[in-house]
Amino acid sequence: FMTWGYKNKPTMYKKLKKEFLRAANLNNLLVIPAGEAFDLGNRSHPEINLYTSDNRHPSEEGTFLAASVVFATLFGRSTEGNSGIGNIEPSVAIKLQRIADKTVSEFFNIQLK
């Protein structure tokens, strides 16, 4: 599970990504690219706050995004339109699902079902 960098430390993510990929390659492990999704989400939808007030831990939206990435990675299926969105606004949920799907598709170079 590739984590994300802190909100106020923009260069942290690239270092984390490098080390997660190195460790996974050395040990033949699957990487769930949650950090990659956070990076894309922060760049493409900065209006969606993925962090709690400590700028480190995920907000409800960040948790939803990470869970969507886990689902798409493990099942190879799109998350778009999944109805289990909890307290997240539907318009925000669809954006986060699209971020998760795009991240997983590009990270693994696959087409989600």
Where are these regions (language model features)?
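Surface-exposed cleft-lining segments at the edges of enzyme active sites
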Residues: 1-9
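Long, charge-rich low-complexity segments
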Residues: 102-113
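Catalytic His-Asp segment of secreted/periplasmic serine-dependent ester chemistry enzymes
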Residues: 10-103
